[in-house]
Amino acid sequence: MTKTGGVVLSVLLAAFTGLFLRAEEKLRTLTGSCSITASSNGTEADLRLERSGCEDRGNCSSTQTQEQLSAFSGFSLADLQHEGAHVDARIRAEAGTITCSGGVHDGRMSGAFTFVPDPAFVDRMLQMGFHDLEAEKLEAYTLFDIGIAWVHSLQAAGVGSLDSGNLIALRIFHVDTDYIHSLNALGYATPDAGKLTALRVQHVNPEEVKQVRAMGYQPTLDELIQMRIFKVTPDFIHRMQARGLNDLTISKLVQIRIFQLAD
């Protein structure tokens, strides 16, 4: 091998090693403490996870979610009635597996948790163009059941600006192709990820849009978000029209709400 060839090989090996180490870092197992209690509705459990060993990463925040009982294996609410019982509760999803193991005391299961990411899931996501899939993010994917089929459906629907971070918000606020298609049916182009999240956060729904349109308005998506933020509802518009204010633009209606001119 020539000297130049040896240098090139060394560089390639170093690059490969660096990529491998970064991948291993992202796929590290997370550990910490956990607890499970019954939620008030009787169909869910309150799960709390608090990571350990993260002092050097600046990300020691705890996570608390309400999980459907069907999400668990090895656990039921009846276990919380057995004082001193040992429980191994697991949540398995495409992104990985969370295991919370511990004992029951006073209706509460407390112990230690591990989260093990699934390398095959990460490989698929990389192939689909998603990066920065660190273990903490994959843990959230597991808790919110973010899977390949759902992600692919968003891509197929033409949702722009998707990344590994905003997928979590899209999932939390129940953005799916049914919602996207309902907007398309009203003549709106498919919004990007950020706007879809904003629409869902503000509870913009097709039925209310139809009511607003029936009153002579053709709101943009941004205007729909503003209308929800400032409570410019069909009822509010009717009240303004009853006062003889029939030619108010959406912008004027929003200003009336902002400055409380209708009171």
Label for each model-derived stretch:
Residues 1-8:
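Bacterial N-terminal signal peptides that target proteins for export
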Residues 10-16:
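Bacterial N-terminal signal peptides
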Residues 5, 18-263:
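General marker for long, soluble alpha-helical cores
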